[in-house]
Swiss-Prot record:
Superkingdom of this protein's organism: Bacteria
Cellular compartment(s): Cytoplasm
Descriptive protein name: Proline--tRNA ligase
Record has rRNA processing as a keyword: no
Gene: proS
Keywords, in A-Z order: Aminoacyl-tRNA synthetase, ATP-binding, Cytoplasm, Ligase, Nucleotide-binding, Protein biosynthesis
Amino acid sequence: MRLSQMLFVTLRDEPAEAEIPSHKLLLRAGYIRRIASGIYSYLPLMWRVLQKVSAIVREEMNRSGALECLLPQLQPAELWQESGRWDTYTKAEGIMFSLTDRAQRQLGLGPTHEEVITALAKDLIRSYRQLPVHLYQIQTKFRDEIRPRFGLMRGREFIMKDGYSFHADVASLKETYQVMYDTYSRILQRCGLTFRAVEADSGAIGGSGSHEFMVLAAAGEDEVLYTADGQYAANVEKAVSLPPDAVPTTYKTVATLDTPNAATIDALVEQLQCHPTQIVKNVLYRAVFDNGRVGLVLVSIRGDQEVNSVKLHNTLTSLAPNYGATKLLDLRLADAHTAQEWAATPIPFGYIGPDLEDAVIKADSQIIPQWIRIADRTVVELKRFITGANRDQQHRVGVNWGKSCPLPAIIADVRKAQAGDRACHDPTQHLEAARGIEIGHIFQLGTKYSEAMKATYTNEQGEEVPLVMGCYGIGISRLAQAAVEQHHDAQGIVWPLAIAPYQVIIVVPNIGDAQQMQAATDLYEQLQAAGIEVLLDDRDERAGVKFKDADLIGIPYRLVTGRAIANGEVELIIRATGAKSTLPLTEVVRYLQKEIAQQLAP
């Protein structure tokens, strides 16, 4: 392609809307343009990148035995109501674009396709002889993000590969799950990305187990915790660990002390000259279940630890049937302002104990009249600890679990693991932290959707049983931007060869020089004939502008038909390293063919 014939516009200044390097560079280099918040046009260079990523994904999915199809973007609400996710996606999380057609039927623009594919399986799969089967698609998805940001990382419209497998049993599911784990690893390796597969929370998708594939980058939204021995890695939402041992207190008896202005752990530690591991802090939440009932949650956790909201959400979801509900719609931290909605008397925030009375909860038919009390495992073994006295400006010391302060009946891991914690599999190993961008997510769904939607098959014994499912997603557009986030420098993008829009760019410093132009044109035609993807910068621009643009757009190999042409040579610059050399014109094609073949070899 000749750059003079391409719609190619670069920006010298960083766009004000962009926050992270990859977003800035994709805008500056003319790869994408913003149409509205979270909505982007993919310009010709970007479309070539996306096609290359899609091709790698498609090759590896086909290699795994999966079958490509295309599912509708517009989905009827009935399917989502059947699975029980309509309210979750349109009200609780609110991420689905929904609409009503002229016949007053509710529809949604698909953020994911579990319901559609399960309905298809229900209609098409009858016997165990048809199993296992794995279908996938590559298409545009939609999410009504509250705050779209970071360009293609968190947009309202994006390209994704999603696949769904159906099985006769869990053993078969696990086989395909491992195949997909290996497939995703190969995809990211072929795309030239450094990544880590980590244990993850299944979120609204559900299921018994899942892994995320994280591309490591400083600007990643997710925190990954891992051990140096390579035996453990997890998203911080899912991670488990052993916290530091608690320091014993010196208190012998229970006493109530005045602790003015000690509503925070730091202030209390300073005032009592104690250690945060000796404190039981108590955190309040307001939970809303899908039947409209409101639960007030009191979490007791060690003073040096933080509550993991995802783990707490999952714990409360498992408790939902106790309150006539099936799921949790909303969970928010309570404070003095929001407490006015449900508190019968003022709540002494900062001085709350695990035994705060139920009587402080306002009488209301929609509000559960008792605290949902949850103790994190870090507090269970504490003795003679410090905690709130349930009175403003006062704390109790020397407290033990028992009659005076009952241990909550619900004990769960709701703490946030952190770097420095000991690993569960080997306490001599300590967790380390890294930032990551979630590119892929694979799930063992089990029978969650098939049971809800009555998608069954007849097994070998002639029994009608639910299909066992797995699902597997990888973000195509997100992967492309993540590659830029991981591969860039001060001059611009440094594309991995496998997904670069072009493999070679030829720069003509002076198009008025007939010898330079003729050499460039000859090379251009020879490289094209050899099957090498080449871009010819034949614009009427200054040489400095062309060199800066070549660095900015990140093409892996640059050929310059400058002064060396007089000696029958061309300058070669490798974008990733900046290494420069000269090659005889007669050797250029052969050299690049060999280099590119070696880099793209499996």
